[in-house]
């Protein structure tokens, strides 16, 4: 009996080790994102989020986003920032526009850790739309496109598609988006 038990334990150990080895961290901007790191520690490694990281630094939000949270961050890519009118990003990064930049960035953050599954449940419970209150105090509305892809609508009517959901962090979750969302 002990021999069978030992073989069973060995097989379970092999199966668990194989399952863990097969799990991969999500890749964002060419780099693996680690759930043991916080939002800022992961974001600085993403080649697709250099503009966002520069903006977070300029707004003085690094300490906040390195904090305990949890936070849900809808993280626009460099391409998303490039869609803004010419000169907008450069203007926002100027010290005299720190308050406006902070307002825009905190509009991309919701308190709590909302996975894509959580958002989809809220969308279903809201008959197709979930209303999210941002850290900035404004509203975002989440809905589904093609039945599965989460789309955000901002207060100005702009839309952003979640392109990479569920990038879990030690202090929350990042959902990569393809457009910058803007508050009123």
Predicted regions and their residues:
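Short amphipathic alpha-helical "recognition" segments used for binding
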Residues: 7-8, 83
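Cytosolic-facing loops and C-terminal tails of multi-pass membrane proteins
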Residues: 2, 18-21
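Bacterial N-terminal signal peptides
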Residues: 8-16
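Bacterial N-terminal signal peptides that target proteins for export
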Residues: 1-7
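Mature, structured domains of secreted/extracytosolic soluble proteins
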Residues: 20-184
